Amino acid sequence: MNSLLIITACLVLIGTVWAKDGYLVDVKGCKKNCYKLGENDYCNRECKMKHRGGSYGYCYGFGCYCEGLSDSTPTWPLPNKRCGGK
């Protein structure tokens, strides 16, 4: 019984540690813009969308930064792709 609890706790911790953070990208591969720095309802809403799986979002450096994103969510900078597709 104790072993089962320890294994479950480890799996939960691994899932938390492996969640990724980063800037959201738009369709052109650029950071999603925001203008109200710090706590930002728009960024928080965008990060928590079901298909992104983020836990929290805020505006940092005029871009929406998300914590706890799923691995499948693309973040800026995209590998081998520049902002604007060039």
UniProtKB/Swiss-Prot annotation:
Has the structural arrangement of an alpha-helix connected to antiparallel beta-sheets by disulfide bonds (CS-alpha/beta). SMART domains: Knot1 (SM00505). Beta toxins bind voltage-independently at site-4 of sodium channels (Nav) and shift the voltage of activation toward more negative potentials thereby affecting sodium channel activation and promoting spontaneous and repetitive firing. Expressed by the venom gland. CDD domains: neurotoxins_LC_scorpion. Disulfide bonds join C30-C83, C34-C59, C43-C64, C47-C66. The keyword Disulfide bond applies. One of its GO terms (biological process) is defense response. This is Toxin CngtIV. Residues 20-84 form the LCN-type CS-alpha/beta domain. Residues 1-19 form the signal peptide. It comes from Centruroides noxius (Mexican scorpion). It comes from the Eukaryota. One of its GO terms (cellular component) is extracellular region.
